[in-house]
């Protein structure tokens, strides 16, 4: 699978209309993914602010159609470089940027670059001379793990121009979790109502045989045609990034990240419609098994409490648990690295609805208009 084929795939992904997205079986999961990115960027900005930077220079590497442009606006970015191998996606990102309400006044500067970040030197194309304060790579880095050279080039492009103390954040499939799922499935396949994961070479799945690079799998969500992806073991990602003086700040499976962000990010999660109300007459999952946790939560609620919870169907939750979030920082000194802990998969936590709004919600969250036209996972 060459980067050109990846580009071809993403260039041809149809832009779903608002109505299509609302009717999608994974409507809430997509919104949840989008909320996770918002929370991650929010946390990264706190670290960037600690460096004394209020208006960061940002690189959004493998930015797709620019689904995070609004988030960059909210961070108060000074300049954002958006790079992707898919030219049509970059064109759409640039068009979106131009329709943003403040354009061309009072909005961050931006550069849109078409580049295969596994082969080309991005630095040759970047116009701004300042180093980056923040780099974001959402749902994309693993494509570069097709082979070692590609992964190394991609990571160099990602963090090579990051300033000392600068932050690198991202999301990617959790290789351990995926291998676990396909090993426990049938003939290298894991499937539920919303996602299907197939590991291509089943004989590689025996203990110790999954290669570090080129471990190809197919991940299809909501029956969308997918393009092949590659496992990126987090310990390997960490190792490769350490060669660029990057130190690990955190890594969490999505389940763990959601639990951590539920209190500070609850208001935003509700406004972004990241949870489905249970019970309701038009649930996206069609069997009782999809909502056993939510049902148990409802049954445990005392009297005089509204009998509604916010939840995700079991299948969406299983799919979301296939991903992790991470944050690294370029070392300022020779501080000792923080060690990553093995991510533990928690159960879906249904959230009682109609309670007082969380007071600690970030003021930025109120400003997000949830009209995102391209929520991830794309
Ligand atoms: C799942 S999409 C994520 C898009 C965006 N980051 C988001 O969160 O919505 C993966 C993106 O990675 C891009 N990509 C894959 N391989 C790439 C490469 N070699 N160089 C640059 N971009 C690449 C694809 O074109 C696609 O836009």
Curated annotation (Swiss-Prot):
Q: Which InterPro entries match?
A: mRNA_G-N7_MeTrfase_dom (IPR004971), mRNA_G-N7_MeTrfase_euk (IPR016899), RG7MT1 (IPR039753), SAM-dependent_MTases_sf (IPR029063)
Molecular function terms, GO-annotated: mRNA 5'-cap (guanine-N7-)-methyltransferase activity; RNA binding
Task: State the EC number(s).
Answer: 2.1.1.56
Instruction: Look at the named UniProt entry and state the broad enzyme category this protein falls under.
Output: transferase
Instruction: Name the Gene3D superfamilies on file.
Output: Vaccinia Virus protein VP39 (3.40.50.150)
Q: What is this protein called?
A: mRNA cap guanine-N(7) methyltransferase
Q: What does this protein do?
A: mRNA-capping methyltransferase that methylates the N7 position of the added guanosine to the 5'-cap structure of mRNAs. Binds RNA containing 5'-terminal GpppC.
Site positions for mRNA cap binding: 65, 71, 96, 142, 229, 323
Subcellular location per UniProt equals: Nucleus
Q: Which GO terms describe its biological process?
A: 7-methylguanosine mRNA capping
**Any idea where the mRNA cap 0 methyltransferase domain is?**
24-331
């Amino acid at each position: 699978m060459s980067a050109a084929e990846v580009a071809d795939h993403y260039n041809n992904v149809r832009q779903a209309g608002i109505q299509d997205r609302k009717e999608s079986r994974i409507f809430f999961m997509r919104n949840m993914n989008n909320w996770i990115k918002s929370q991650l960027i929010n946390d990264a900005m706190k670290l960037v602010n600690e460096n004394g930077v209020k208006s960061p220079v940002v690189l959004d590497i493998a930015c797709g159609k620019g689904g995070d442009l609004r988030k960059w606006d909210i961070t108060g970015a000074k300049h954002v470089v958006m790079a992707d191998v898919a030219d049509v996606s970059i064109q759409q990102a640039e068009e979106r940027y131009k329709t943003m309400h403040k354009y061309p006044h009072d909005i961050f500067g931006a550069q849109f670059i078409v580049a295969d970040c596994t082969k080309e030197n991005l630095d040759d194309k970047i116009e701004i001379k300042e180093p980056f304060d923040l780099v974001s790579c959402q749902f994309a880095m693993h494509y570069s793990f097709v082979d070692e050279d590609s992964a190394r080039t991609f990571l160099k492009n990602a963090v090579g121009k990051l300033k000392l103390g600068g932050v690198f954040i991202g999301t990617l499939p959790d290789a351990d979790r995926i291998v676990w799922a396909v090993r426990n499935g049938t003939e290298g396949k894991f499937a539920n109502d919303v996602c299907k994961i197939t590991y291509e070479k089943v004989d590689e799945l025996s203990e110790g045989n999954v290669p570090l690079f080129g471990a190809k799998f197919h991940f299809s969500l909501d029956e969308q045609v997918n393009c092949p992806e590659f496992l990126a073991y987090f310990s390997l990602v960490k190792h490769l990034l350490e060669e660029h003086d990057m130190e690990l700040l955190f890594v969490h499976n999505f389940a763990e990240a959601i639990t951590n962000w539920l209190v500070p990010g609850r208001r935003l999660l509700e406004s972004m419609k990241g949870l489905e109300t249970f019970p309701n007459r038009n649930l996206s999952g069609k069997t009782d098994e999809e909502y056993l946790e939510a049902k148990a939560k409802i049954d445990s609620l005392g009297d005089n409490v509204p009998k509604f919870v916010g939840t995700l169907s079991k299948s969406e939750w299983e799919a979301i648990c296939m991903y992790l979030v991470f944050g690294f920082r370029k070392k300022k000194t020779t501080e000792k690295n923080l060690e990553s802990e093995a991510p533990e998969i928690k159960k879906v936590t249904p959230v009682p609805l109609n309670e007082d709004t969380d007071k600690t919600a970030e003021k930025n969250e109120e400003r997000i208009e949830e009209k995102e036209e391209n929520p991830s996972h794309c």
